[in-house]
Each structure stands twice: as C-alpha cells, then as structure tokens.
C-alpha cells in the first residue's frame, strides 16, 4: 500500500507472546477436512476457488498473489529482514517441539533448516544447557524415526555456565554478536 502512495496503519495483536515464527503462509491445506498439507499452494488455491468461490482468497488470482508476496518480501528485505525467495512450492520446517509446519516463505536464517528437513542428511542438533524453550534431546526423539543420522548434544553457552535457566530472548540477543556466535560454534 505504501508503495502505491496509500496511507498505511499497522494493526496488530498486543498479546503476551514475544516472538512470531517469521514464517509467511499462503495456503497449505485444502480441503480443510482432509488435514493433508499440500506442497503446491497454487493448486490448493485453484481448488479453493473452485470449491468455495466466495472465499476471500478465491477472489484473488494466482498472479496477483505471487506479485503481492514478491512485493512484501522485497519490503521486508528493505527493512533488513531477508527471506528466501518464494517459489511455486510450499516448504516444510521442523518446529522446536518436533512437528512439521508447512509454509510458503521462510527467513533466510531458516532456509538451511527447511532444506535439511527435505533431504534429511546426518545432522547434529545442538541444545543449550538451561534453555527453557528448546530441548535438542526432545527434538531428536520426535524426529529420530523419520530422520536417520539425527543426533544431539548439549553445550553451555559461553558466559552463562552459572545460570540455572536461560530464555530464548536473552540467548538470541547474545548470539547477535559475531564474537558470541564464534565462541559458541567453537564448542561444537
């Protein structure tokens, strides 16, 4: 809208969640009763338009959706939030609790994880001792039967060895510094 010279107002939920996933969804499940995720969002969109012509998404053509996503991803890049270029396909990402989420576009920082889930190479999942919101052991337990060669290790984040509990927001802030990332990587 801003690109077209329109006035913009951002409206959001002021809930208690500190984080959003950063994933950009298009359409992964249609018909909803099937519960089956589709890797082709545009085929799902065409089926939605055929099956539920009054649905708001059915009123927008595929080319306009592609253009809108491209413009949105470009605007995010202009704000320093880089995304892997959306393609014609959805991708799957592993969640921290061992489930799989189908989505359309991922931040570049998550693209390697989506690629790894698709190809399932031998991988080491690194957990941080004391981190409350993620367990590498739980992740491997959830995916182990579907991902041969997946293993885990737990490390102490440099400078936090005495902390009983760590929170993702603090760890993320610490790891923004290249030196902190380098020290952490050296432990693995």
Protein language model annotation of sequence segments:
Residues 1-2, 28, 68, 186:
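Small-side-chain structural scaffolding
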